[in-house]
Structure formats: structure tokens, C-alpha cells
Design a protein with these regions (language model features):
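SAM cofactor-binding core of SAM-dependent methyltransferases
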Residues: 75, 79-132, 140-143, 163, ...
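S-adenosyl-L-methionine
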Residues: 2-75, 83-84, 90
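PRPP-dependent phosphoribosyltransferase catalytic core
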Residues: 132-149, 155
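Glycine-rich, phosphate-binding/catalytic loops in enzymes
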Residues: 91, 113-114, 260-270
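Conserved proline-anchored active-site loop of SAM-dependent methyltransferases
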Residues: 63, 74-88, 97-102, 241-262
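A general structural motif
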Residues: 70-72, 92, 170, 244-245
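SAM-dependent nucleic-acid methyltransferase catalytic core
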Residues: 6, 38-40, 45, 56, ...
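A conserved mid-domain beta-alpha-beta active-site/ligand-binding segment of alpha/beta enzyme cores
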Residues: 291-293
Length: 293
């Protein structure tokens, strides 16, 4: 069973997706093999760029412009990629970011809640090292879709190695792996198509290189704004009664007569990857192998 019933549904979905933005990262690229391990000054810190569906990347300046001057704390109830929450953190506000999806939660823990923890070069080499004890779930269940030959096994290996980490280091690694799986040459940035058009063409070596870059970028985004920011993973109806803030920002999934964006199905691969599909059951007759929700 395909995610979209008609071509019109698929087109509506794609029209909601922001195009990926290029990031000028020459300063960090020049330091090949050396991760940023301490806080960068604001003018040296890279922008947080995302191509997550519905991202307000292009609107963060407008959102800040319309934020009242006396606001000191903000709740982002559907944080998604975390781009708005991160913007508010850079402005010195206390941020409470919430999202039901695990990938979004790990992203928020990595760059919103996290104040000073970063991956080291040794951590990165460990994550990319061979692991004969790694599982084969991705290789066994997603063969031929989403990624080029050899990448499925590499994802299994990196994911197994991530379990050797704890705390914010693990969040950074999961965030980086998810971002790497979403991006690359080809593909739509999500996992709604099993056709060749939905397959990323990167070789295993190119995947490793992008994973390294994503770790470097995330490391560089980590900073302490002097406020206790928090990431949560709760149903919004449970989350809101528990928190207090000067401002509440709401950007929920959109449902219209033309489209109902199901983020969990669109990003089912990275969502499953966050727990290595523990407790999840794949829909075997689905071409995209999404799990039951």
C-alpha cells in the first residue's frame, strides 16, 4: 500500500516541502578531521539549515520581528526540525521545545537543551568503525529502496555504534545520522516513495563524508545561552498543561482538503532508526516498508 492514493496527493505533499538550502561551511571544512569541541562566538556559528517538511527556515527573521520585546521564555509545541526553537535560543530566550516524533526530540536535545556537550574526533571514528556485532535490520528489510548498494549495511553499523554513546552525545549522533539519511544526491528528503526517484544515489564513502559533515555542523551549533532550555517528547495535550512561558508558538501539521501530511509516515525510516525499530511492526505489503501506526 502506497502512502499516496493519487498523483494529486503526491504533488500536494511535495509542494509543502521546502527546498534544501546550501550552507556556507568553508570555515569548518578547512578543518578536515578536526571537530569543533568548544563553543563558537555567535558570528562564527553556522546557521541551522534544514529541509524538513514544513520548516520555517525562510521565516525565522519574520517570526522574530513579530515577537514582543518583553518575551523571555517561549514554548514551541510542535518543534519539528527545531529551526524556530533554535532561533529563539540564539536570541537569549528560555526555550521549551516539544514534538511527538523521536527524531525531532533528539534534534531538540542535541541543539536546544544541550549546552556544551559535543562529539570528539575519537567519537566520530568509533561511530564509523566496522562492527561485526551490528544488526542487519536495514540491510534485510530495505534492500533496493531509499539508498544505493552498500549504504544499508553502513547505516546498520553506525546505528549499532551509536548505542555505545550516552546522553547528549547519543542525541547528536542520532540527529546526524537521521539528517544524513534524509539528504544526499537524489531522493525527496523523506521516505514516501520506493521508486528510483526516491533513492539517494550516494555511495557508502559519500554517505560517510556527509555524516562527518553533519556531525561537524551539529557540534558547531551547540552553545549555552545562559537559560535552561528543555526538549520534550509528549502529546501536545499532555505537554501544554505542564509548562509555563511568556509566548507559545504553534505550527502543527496541516490538514486540508488537498493534503493531510503524516510526518510519521513521511519520515518512517528515520523514526524507526531512532530505536532501531524496537517494538515496531513493518507493514510487509507496503512498498516503502513503513511501520504500523
Amino acid at each position: 500500500m502506497e502512502l499516496f492514493a493519487t498523483d494529486r496527493d503526491r504533488l500536494a505533499f511535495l509542494l509543502e516541502t521546502d527546498a534544501a538550502l546550501d550552507l556556507d561551511f568553508e570555515a569548518l571544512e578547512a578543518r578536515a578531521g578536526e571537530l569543533v569541541t568548544e563553543e563558537l562566538p555567535p558570528d562564527k556559528r553556522p546557521k541551522y539549515i534544514t529541509n524538513y517538511i514544513g520548516s520555517k527556515q525562510k521565516l525565522v527573521d519574520w517570526i522574530w520581528k513579530h515577537t514582543p520585546e518583553d518575551v523571555e521564555s517561549v514554548v514551541d509545541a510542535f518543534s519539528g526540525s527545531g529551526v524556530v526553537a533554535y532561533m529563539y535560543k540564539t536570541k537569549g530566550l528560555q526555550v521549551l521545545a516539544n514534538d511527538r516524533l523521536r527524531y525531532c526530540y533528539h534534534a531538540a536535545r542535541a541543539i536546544i537543551e544541550n549546552r556544551n556537550v559535543r562529539l570528539t574526533d575519537d567519537d566520530l571514528e568509533m561511530l564509523l568503525a566496522d562492527n561485526p556485532k551490528a544488526g542487519t535490520f536495514v540491510r534485510d528489510n530495505f534492500k533496493g529502496i531509499f539508498f544505493a548498494k552498500g549504504v544499508h549495511g553502513l547505516i546498520d553499523t553506525i546505528r549499532a555504534n551509536i548505542d555505545k554513546l550516552e546522553g547528549y552525545k547519543k542525541d547528536i549522533a542520532l540527529f546526524a545520522l537521521g539528517k544524513t539519511c534524509m539528504s544526499g544526491k537524489g531522493g525527496f528528503g523523506h521516505f514516501s516513495s520506493s521508486t528510483r526517484y526516491g533513492k539517494r544515489e550516494d555511495t557508502p564513502e559519500e554517505f560517510r563524508k556527509r555524516f562527518r559533515k553533519n556531525v561537524a555542523r551539529i557540534n558547531a551549533l551547540v552553545f549555552d545561552n545562559g537559560k535552561e532550555c528543555k526538549a520534550c517528547r509528549k502529546d501536545v495535550n499532555e505537554f501544554l498543561p505542564e509548562v509555563k512561558a511568556d509566548l507559545a508558538y504553534f505550527d502543527p501539521p496541516y490538514a486540508t482538503e488537498f493534503s493531510t501530511t503524516n510526518y510519521e509516515k513521511a519520515y518512517h525510516f528515520v523514526e524507526g532508526l531512532m530505536t532501531y525499530w524496537k517494538g515496531l511492526t513493518l507493514v510487509e505489503d507496503s512498498k516503502t516498508k513503513h511501520y504500523e501506526t
